[in-house]
A protein has these predicted regions:
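Aromatic- and acid-rich polysaccharide-binding/catalytic face
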Residues: 57-65, 139, 145, 186-189, ...
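Bacterial N-terminal signal peptides
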Residues: 15-27
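Substrate-binding cleft and catalytic face of glycoside hydrolase catalytic domains
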Residues: 55-73, 82-194, 256
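Bacterial N-terminal signal peptides that target proteins for export
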Residues: 3-17
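Boundary/entry segment of secreted carbohydrate-active catalytic domains
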Residues: 31-65
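Short, acidic/polar
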Residues: 44-56, 122-131, 197-209, 265-270
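Acidic-and-aromatic substrate-binding clefts and catalytic sites of carbohydrate-active enzymes
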Residues: 40-52, 68-81, 108, 148-152, ...
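Aromatic-rich peripheral "rim/lid" segments of glycoside hydrolase catalytic domains that contact
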Residues: 72, 110-113, 130, 142-166, ...
């Protein structure tokens, strides 16, 4: 018990430092999308202060702090401190905040696997309802993350495939709609911009949710686009746009080690995403060297200097 209390105390101290550091930092910034109709955002890590964030970005997605396993690693013991700090940071700056995520087959609480189905469903409901009570002003929520590729082990408890093939997803969105009535609800999936089977399967789920008025937008992950043709990306965006729902590019990164090659790919790809009429915002998945999921996708070097792609992006967004 003492070890658990000590660990929780340290986590609270780290999160408090994170919040104070960001709130008391310089107040004058010029984010790249400031004053524009669309946001250009990024992720914030767990408890690491990032004084450079507001220099570039005006939308916040928690990288890990909003995942259920991070908030409730032990059943009934909620660790909100990291998420509290990021939510308050976004609100204090006037930045858009997106919760990532409610239901995902990875980084789910390990203790869920030992529960009977009725308890699994109850715990999932509690998780969503507690979030809604604590963060009522959340603008966007990734309700279900990667349903095509990473389904939760407890999906049968939420309705399983059912008559639609995706009843568990319907349950998640219905529950989120009930407890987060002021948030826009998103389905977040990868590989859609590459076209093909994944795109069509995602569209099937989106249509099921749209018929029930349960979905407000489409989260389109931007991983793995280094070698996807521009024509395929345009076609996929148009296909998604035909659903008449806003599109949010949710996890953009270009994992390219060579500076010139990365800049060239940004120059060809980013305008396609940014200027598509259905796309209402773009979120990158990290930007700092050594603090990013894809090791060569960084835009800001460890010494604080900007890679050519970031220099170009700043210039492009200034017009």
């Amino acid at each position: 018990m003492n070890r658990e209390l000590t660990r929780r105390h340290i986590e609270c101290q780290r999160s408090l430092f994170f919040l104070i550091f960001l709130l008391l930092g310089p107040s004058l910034y010029a984010q790249m999308a400031q004053g524009k109709a669309k946001f250009l955002g990024n992720i914030l890590g767990n408890s690491q202060p990032d004084p450079d964030f507001a220099t570039y970005w005006n939308q916040v997605t928690p990288e890990n702090s909003g995942k259920w396993a991070s908030v409730e690693p032990t059943r009934g013991l909620m660790e909100w401190s990291g998420l509290d700090a990021m939510y308050q940071y976004a609100r204090s700056r006037g930045f858009v905040f997106k919760q990532h995520n409610f239901i995902w087959g990875r980084q789910q609480p390990s203790w869920m696997d030992s529960l009977p189905p009725d308890q699994q469903k109850l715990e999932a409901k509690k998780w969503i309802s507690q979030y809604g009570q604590r963060y009522p002003d959340t603008q966007f929520i990734d309700v279900v993350n990667e349903p095509l590729h990473n389904q939760p082990s407890y999906k049968k408890a939420l309705g399983g495939d059912g008559s639609t093939g995706w009843d568990w997803v319907i349950w998640a969105f219905s529950t989120a709609r009930r407890y987060c009535p002021h948030s826009k609800l998103l389905l977040n999936e990868y590989n859609m911009l590459a076209g093909g089977k994944d795109l069509e399967q995602a569209i099937t789920i989106i249509k099921i949710l749209k018929r029930r008025n349960l979905i407000d937008g489409i989260g389109v992950q931007g991983h793995g686009l280094e070698n996807v043709s521009d024509a395929t990306i345009r076609s996929s965006l148009n296909r998604l746009g035909s659903l008449r729902l806003p599109i949010y590019i949710s996890e953009l990164d270009l994992n390219i080690a060579d500076d010139d090659s990365q800049q060239k790919r940004y120059k060809s790809l980013f305008p396609i995403l940014w200027h598509h009429s259905a796309v209402k915002g773009v979120t990158l998945w990290g930007y700092k060297q050594n603090h990013i999921w894809k090791s060569n996708a960084y835009l800001l070097r460890a010494d604080g200097s900007e890679r050519p792609a970031l220099v170009w992006l700043k210039e492009y967004m200034s017009h």
